[in-house]
């Protein structure tokens, strides 16, 4: 069996084969994420310095008291663009430093830069996966410029993008809400296992109520993604620990500000209202997509017929696990292919449109696969926590640490821990989970209702799902006793949800009370009096 990869899902895998020392330096400088195409809208290109002198200088500065020079040199070798051939070396192109690259000469297989006089040729042995916008070039001589005029690249919708992704403070309004909820959850778990008041349920319902009342188009976008586990829904909608990029599912301007949600509690009977949102899934008949070819209007199938979506997902599941090569190479690649089809065409087995256009646009660049793996992992950890005979704060803290530092949503591809084909490569990419256990978790994920997830009404949770085997979903039970041991996570999540009985009795309607609460929070009693007089 060959020991070297011939096709690459990551630039880091190629570096591991060619220069593990340089890869280690990049990793030690916390720059590994900069080599991922998921961080940039237009892919990424890495310039590998063939000259030992440059690599030695990087190493010397990296392990000095001030590694800033090494970081700057490495940034000059990273281009936030997909440039596979000399033909693409055109227009406004620059490095991660923000310095513009000026081309002096282009040949069939070579590019010579003016500033720095770098001579670049495409790496002959770097072939990325078809769905990865990655490229590697070899710098034969010269150097990449560290100083010079800046470059500006156009956004697709006009204006200019900054040369690097935005960096957001770790203590954002989203983070503060999450910390508040986590503290409340820990307290109520120690008191009564949150059987009376579940903070995750309260905030999830409140956010969805706010969107439904004030931003119906955003509500339409996120509704197919909600999860029966309020903890899962909370983290997927709020994305509180994301610190890079601006591709939030729900924009900042909607959540915060004078007319924003701002974490306001908006519910009367949290559990009943939460379940009602799932009932609405089959009633959203006004979310239409115009087919670009026929100009006909299509209702997204996640709304018109969610059961059929699950049926098609089950076909994909069966095809993957009945494949004659169920193994650590073929199986994860088939999973990636299924999600790639969904992201690129909004279809499952050519059946679609599955989601509203706004939803699928928000899930591109591997966010959908990241989300579904996140569902699987968060709920598994949550269920394990709830199944313990006694509650330990340290175990819940471990879940939060996992979300905050391993799965914040900064780099979707790099944060895939179960479904990424790269996780089944050599020993350097498998992390701290044994390969066999990881593969068992992958099979369990495929066999779960989290695979190609779309939300369904409560009454549809049982059905045929319950006839295929095990209903367990604790992380300790993830190794199936047989290949098709089915994990009905939706049913498992409902069981946890039904423990919460948050109810506030009042004669006013829910919508009226929610509007009043929001006015109280943001405009004061004078506005409430006006509202009541109307």
From Swiss-Prot:
Keywords assigned: Disulfide bond, Host cytoplasm, Ubl conjugation, Virion
| Assigned GO CC terms | host cell perinuclear region of cytoplasm; virion component
Taxonomy, top ranks, is: Viruses, Varidnaviria, Bamfordvirae, Nucleocytoviricota, Pokkesviricetes
Which residues are annotated as site, described as DNA-binding?
Answer: 10, 39
Q: Which organism is it from?
A: African swine fever virus (isolate Pig/Kenya/KEN-50/1950)
Copy out the induction comment: Expressed in the late phase of the viral replicative cycle.
Provide the protein name: Polyprotein pp62
Residues the record marks as site: Cleavage: 158-159, 463-464
Asked if Secreted is a keyword of the record, the answer is: no
């Amino acid at each position: 069996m060959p020991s070297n990869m011939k096709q690459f899902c990551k630039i880091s895998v190629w570096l591991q084969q060619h220069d593990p020392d340089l890869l280690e330096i990049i990793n030690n400088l916390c720059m590994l994420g900069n080599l991922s195409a998921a961080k940039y809208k237009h892919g990424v290109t890495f310039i590998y310095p063939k000259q030992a002198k440059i690599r030695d200088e990087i190493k010397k500065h990296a392990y000095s008291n001030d590694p800033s020079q090494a970081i700057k040199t490495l940034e000059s070798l990273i281009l936030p663009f997909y440039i596979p051939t000399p033909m693409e070396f055109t227009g406004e192109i620059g490095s991660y430093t923000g310095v513009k690259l000026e081309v002096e000469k282009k040949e069939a297989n070579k590019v010579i830069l003016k500033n720095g006089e770098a001579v670049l040729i495409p790496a002959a042995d770097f072939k990325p996966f078809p769905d990865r916008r990655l490229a590697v070039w070899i710098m034969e001589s010269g150097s990449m410029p560290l100083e010079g005029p800046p470059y500006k690249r156009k956004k697709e919708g006009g204006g200019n993008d900054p040369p690097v992704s935005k960096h957001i403070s770790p203590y954002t309004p989203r983070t503060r809400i999450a910390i508040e909820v986590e503290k409340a959850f820990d307290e109520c778990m120690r008191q009564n296992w949150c059987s009376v008041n579940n903070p995750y349920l309260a905030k999830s319902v409140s956010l969805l109520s706010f969107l439904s009342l004030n931003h119906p188009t955003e509500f339409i976008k996120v509704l197919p993604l909600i999860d029966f586990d309020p903890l899962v829904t909370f983290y997927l909608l709020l994305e509180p620990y994301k610190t890079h990029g601006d591709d939030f599912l729900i924009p900042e301007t909607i959540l915060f500000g004078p007319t924003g949600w701002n974490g306001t509690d908006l519910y009367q009977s949290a559990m009943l209202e939460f379940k009602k949102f799932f009932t609405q899934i089959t009633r959203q008949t006004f979310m239409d997509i115009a087919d670009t070819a026929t100009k006909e209007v299509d209702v997204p199938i996640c709304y018109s017929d969610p059961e059929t979506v699950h049926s098609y997902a089950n076909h994909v599941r069966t095809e993957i696990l009945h494949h004659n090569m169920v193994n650590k190479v073929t199986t994860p690649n088939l999973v990636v292919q299924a999600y790639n089809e969904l992201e690129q065409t909004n279809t499952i087995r050519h059946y679609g449109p599955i989601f509203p256009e706004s939803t699928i646009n928000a899930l591109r660049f591997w966010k959908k696969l990241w989300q579904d793996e996140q569902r699987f992992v968060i709920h598994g950890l949550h269920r394990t926590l709830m199944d313990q005979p006694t509650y330990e704060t340290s175990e819940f803290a471990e879940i939060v640490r996992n979300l905050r530092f391993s799965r914040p949503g900064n780099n979707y591809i790099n944060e895939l821990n179960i479904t990424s084909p790269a996780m089944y490569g050599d020993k350097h990419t498998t992390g701290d989970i044994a390969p066999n256990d990881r593969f068992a978790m992958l099979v369990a994920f495929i066999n779960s209702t989290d695979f190609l997830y779309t939300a369904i009404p409560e009454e549809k949770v049982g059905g045929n799902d319950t006839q295929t085997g095990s209903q367990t979903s604790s992380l300790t039970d993830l190794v199936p006793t047989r290949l098709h041991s089915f994990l009905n996570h939706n049913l498992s999540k409902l069981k946890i949800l039904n423990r919460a009985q948050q109810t506030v009795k009042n004669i006013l309607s829910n919508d009226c009370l929610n509007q009043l609460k929001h006015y109280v929070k943001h405009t004061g009693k004078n506005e409430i009096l006006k509202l009541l007089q109307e």
